[in-house]
Amino acid sequence: VALAENATVNGVTFLFGHNVGDVLTEDGKVTGVITDHGIIKAPYVINAAGVYADDIAKMAGDQFYTIHGRKGTIAIMDKAKVPSYPRLVSQLTPEYHKGKNVESKGGGMHPTPHMNLLLGPSATEVPDKEDNSTTKKDLDYTMTCNQDPNVTSADVIRIFAGVRPADFKEDFIVEMSELTDGFVHVAAIQSPGLASAPAIAKRV
């Protein structure tokens, strides 16, 4: 929120609920986008569309990657059960230890500033890019991330899920388009995307 407020102070205008239908180009250069609220002219378009980044790239004539959904589920514990470990605790799966290309490093335990303990996330491939449903299987996985003997599944107060924009190369895509001038790819951003955000913004 603080970053968004800072951006607003520095002249950024946020347009929420504007769905992009096409990317406008002329002579191989971006000129703007067509949205369901009209045309927005722009000399640059930064494609940070998450799970739909490949669709936007296709509109700009430069789709060289395919995004597939990978759902992650996180369980929130009751803050009445104070975590025994006040810091981040991560675990690595046996497959990751063996150097195999796995969908998840393993998840972990994440205490919030309010001392709610977060467990997870899981990593499940899903065909629907907007599948934010939660399942018992995913909840069971998040509980395997628990290393705190004082915390049990009875302490879960909420479960939520989101879909990561995974690329088949399992790496971030942050680069200028080689085919369409003014078009910038910021795609396939997974973990540690939040921690990387300032560096990604600086590079872009």
Regions found by a protein language model. Give the residues of each.
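Rossmann-like flavin
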Residues: 1-11
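General beta-strand structural signal in soluble alpha/beta enzymes
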Residues: 14-16, 35, 47, 119, ...
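C-terminal catalytic lobe of FAD-dependent flavoproteins
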Residues: 2, 104, 113-114, 125, ...
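A conserved beta-strand/loop element that lines the FAD pocket in flavoprotein oxidoreductases
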Residues: 10-20
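A short alpha-helix-loop-beta-strand transition element characteristic
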Residues: 13, 63-67, 152-155
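Alpha-helix N-cap/helix-start capping motif
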Residues: 18, 50-51, 198
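Flavin-dependent oxidoreductases
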Residues: 23-29, 34-133, 144
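Conserved positions in beta-strands of structured domains
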Residues: 21-24, 157
